[in-house]
From Swiss-Prot:
Keyword Ion transport: yes
GO annotations of cellular component type: cell outer membrane; pore complex
Gene that specifies this protein: ompC
Signal peptide start-end: 1-21
NCBIfam families, per the entry: PRK10554.1 (NF007841)
Predominant place of localization: membrane
Protein family membership: Belongs to the Gram-negative porin family.
Keywords: Cell outer membrane, Ion transport, Membrane, Porin, Signal, Transmembrane, Transmembrane beta strand, Transport
A Gene Ontology BP annotation from the UniProt entry: monoatomic ion transmembrane transport
Stored PROSITE patterns: GRAM_NEG_PORIN
Protein's UniProt keywords contain Transmembrane: yes
Name by which UniProt lists this protein: Outer membrane porin C
Subcellular location: Cell outer membrane
Amino acid sequence: MKVKVLSLLVPALLVAGAANAAEVYNKDGNKLDLYGKVDGLHYFSDDKSVDGDQTYMRLGFKGETQVTDQLTGYGQWEYQIQGNSAENENNSWTRVAFAGLKFQDVGSFDYGRNYGVVYDVTSWTDVLPEFGGDTYGSDNFMQQRGNGFATYRNTDFFGLVDGLNFAVQYQGKNGSVSGEGMTNNGREALRQNGDGVGGSITYDYEGFGIGAAVSSSKRTDDQNSPLYIGNGDRAETYTGGLKYDANNIYLAAQYTQTYNATRVGSLGWANKAQNFEAVAQYQFDFGLRPSLAYLQSKGKNLGVINGRNYDDEDILKYVDVGATYYFNKNMSTYVDYKINLLDDNQFTRDAGINTDNIVALGLVYQF
């Protein structure tokens, strides 16, 4: 019986971090769910900057309120707290925080810190036990989590076509800490963005999925400084993906092409980058889920770095072999081996890109 229950629970747990949420309140059209996890995590690597304790905790809530028969209000907040640092260090941050309204079949609109629409497709490969999803990053235009997202989403195409979903999104400027490009939440140039727009469309049918997403953001003056490579008026992203999720098998792949949007270590952005991620997983009925993945990000026509001219270089390239074992819906353990395929050379040293392998061991409690 336990084996059969695990085979049903594990796929649900992988859909979203809040899939296993604890219901705190549900009365008179108001609902509040609390979710979170504690990951006792350790890295083993020759790279001393990551080797060691990586323990962290995430905590969040999702709430809904029934305004009318046709209108529902909702909100979500998620926070991460590092458990590997001293108590006097402020190593915690908000991952998402947004509120919105859903108009039955018409769609939903929300605003706040949220995921960019590009992640509607690239999230399909961001399912590895620990690593993965790093051909892009947070606060990187509209590629993943970011600030100031206004998002319209429509599920099942106005209730007419099951599985056909689309989204349209706008992101406001997040600029510098001072000067003409200053905004109230200013940050370093590598995490800034100008006004941006994007959209996504996905279709799921009997376990098969296909999707595409695009985004285009104005770049800030700081980002076009001579201090950085990859200057340009706009940062653009074009992505497409496929997935299969049925019969205990999960397969997914995505290809993304970016212009002035993929970060090159701490040096800036690639004028053009080609990013590819692919993953294969199988869920055994007794709780074991092995995983195999390949990820690569290749920068094109990078330009001059520290007085040296670089053309085409791999920014990221590795094979990932891992496995997760689910004791039950609340407890799991995993191992994830990142086999780095990058060579230690002048480019990686100039860009500050890690070329060492990493083994991650984790023990997770989630609710």
